[in-house]
């Protein structure tokens, strides 16, 4: 069984745990419709992505 040679310092333990926290999702305002959407995602209401029509708009 593996056993650590040294005690993990509180600083190292905290740095390891810093990635475990849940982060709130980010949203950006869509330029065309003004709706909130996730960055780098298609606006599902208008079907636009980066100024191009990639899906048919939902009614």
Swiss-Prot record:
GO terms assigned for molecular function: structural constituent of ribosome
Start-end of Basic and acidic residues biased regions: 28-44
A GO biological process held by the record: translation
Basic residues composition bias: residue spans: 1-16
Gene Ontology CC: large ribosomal subunit
Domain of life: Bacteria
The entry's keywords: Ribonucleoprotein, Ribosomal protein
Family: Belongs to the bacterial ribosomal protein bL32 family.
Name assigned to this protein: Large ribosomal subunit protein bL32
Species the sequence originates in: Brucella anthropi (strain ATCC 49188 / DSM 6882 / CCUG 24695 / JCM 21032 / LMG 3331 / NBRC 15819 / NCTC 12168 / Alc 37) (Ochrobactrum anthropi)
Lineage: Bacteria, Pseudomonadati, Pseudomonadota, Alphaproteobacteria, Hyphomicrobiales
Name of the gene this protein is made from: rpmF
């Amino acid at each position: 069984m593996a056993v650590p040679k040294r005690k993990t310092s509180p600083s190292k333990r905290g740095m390891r745990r810093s990635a475990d926290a849940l982060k709130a999702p980010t949203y950006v305002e869509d330029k065309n419709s003004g709706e909130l959407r996730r960055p780098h995602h298609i606006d599902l209401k208008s079907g636009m992505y980066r100024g191009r029509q990639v899906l048919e708009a939902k009614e």
